[in-house]
């Protein structure tokens, strides 16, 4: 999982979901797991 300042480019990938957990924003992608990221 990467920690990124901006998730905009990742959320446009096919299969990406934006999720809020414990006050943090995550992008999870079951199709391409290397695009997992947290905003921070």
Curated annotation (Swiss-Prot):
Protein name: Large ribosomal subunit protein bL36
PANTHER family: 50S RIBOSOMAL PROTEIN L36 2, LARGE RIBOSOMAL SUBUNIT PROTEIN BL36B
Naturally occurring in which organism (per UniProt): Corynebacterium jeikeium (strain K411)
GO molecular-function term, one example from the UniProt record: structural constituent of ribosome
Keyword Cell inner membrane: no
Family per record: Belongs to the bacterial ribosomal protein bL36 family.
Alphabetical list of HAMAP family matching this protein: Ribosomal_bL36 (MF_00251)
Taxonomic lineage of the native organism: Bacteria, Bacillati, Actinomycetota, Actinomycetes, Mycobacteriales
Any one GO cellular component localisation term in the record: ribosome
Gene (UniProt): rpmJ
Keywords, comma-separated and alphabetical: Ribonucleoprotein, Ribosomal protein
GO biological process, one term: translation
Classification via InterPro entries: Ribosomal_bL36, Ribosomal_bL36_sp, Ribosomal_L36_bact
Taxonomy, superkingdom: Bacteria
